[in-house]
Amino acid sequence: MDKIYAIIPVNQFANAKTRLSPFLTPEERRDLLKAMLKDITDTLKPIVDKVVIISRDEEVLAYAEELELTTIVEEEYKKSKAVNSSDDNPLNKALKQAMKWSRKKTRKVIILPSDIPLIGKTNVKLLIDQAKNFDFIIVPSKGGGTNTLIIKPLAIDMKFEGFSFNKHIEEAKRKKLVPIVHDSFYMALDVNTTEDLGEIMLHGNGTETKKYLESLGIKVESSHDHERLKVTRD
């Protein structure tokens, strides 16, 4: 059994990307997340054995089924009483649930967020090839978080939230795993701000995400202000 499953946790569409408000309306943010999710899963489908979406949102699960993805309904979150438990975070609990579901079906999992539409087949193939020889591969996000993990199911406790990159490295070392770090501009780019939208406009040729942003009349130009890119819309 030398399979690899992709696991993507997705929050509610209705609450997506609030940091992009008021630049994008709630409906536009919902459609943006749908476009990003399609880009990511279209990239993954030919490369992994199964793409799994875990969510508690019926709209997310229905959309995932439209995309012909495997879905898992997230268990109702109940805050753990244990101090510093990874289960205090609903995202970590959802990922643990998905890995429990996966562990007898696949040798490894690749865990990704739903907002990194520029990951690209080349990057993903490279990581999966590396995973044949290494049991812990991690891709940092630009803000100290974690944008991709490849591990055996339940190999470590999930430490998402805040500066999770260093937390996951520490957890790997605690479990005697050798961390392999893959730095990639495209995989580090998670979309949270208007400047991130500008990066998609510059680098997202051929993606559903860029096509959607273009349909909104979004434009980008160089800026000499405190932000590197000036992002506007018609």
From Swiss-Prot:
Query: EC number(s) for this protein?
Result: 2.7.7.68
Is the keyword Nucleotide-binding assigned to this protein?
yes
Q: In which pathway does this enzyme or protein participate?
A: Cofactor biosynthesis; coenzyme F420 biosynthesis
- Reactions the enzyme catalyzes: (2S)-2-phospholactate + GTP + H(+) = (2S)-lactyl-2-diphospho-5'-guanosine + diphosphate
Keyword Transferase tagged: yes
GO biological process assignments: F420-0 metabolic process
Record-linked Pfam families = CofC
One GO MF term attached to the UniProt entry: phospholactate guanylyltransferase activity
Q: Recite the UniProt keywords alphabetically.
A: GTP-binding, Nucleotide-binding, Nucleotidyltransferase, Transferase
Similarity comment text for this entry:
Belongs to the CofC family.
Function according to Swiss-Prot or TrEMBL:
Guanylyltransferase that catalyzes the activation of (2S)-2-phospholactate (2-PL) as (2S)-lactyl-2-diphospho-5'-guanosine, via the condensation of 2-PL with GTP. It is involved in the biosynthesis of coenzyme F420, a hydride carrier cofactor.
Subunit arrangement?
A: Homodimer.
> What is this protein called in UniProt?
2-phospho-L-lactate guanylyltransferase
The organism of origin for this protein: Methanobrevibacter ruminantium (strain ATCC 35063 / DSM 1093 / JCM 13430 / OCM 146 / M1)
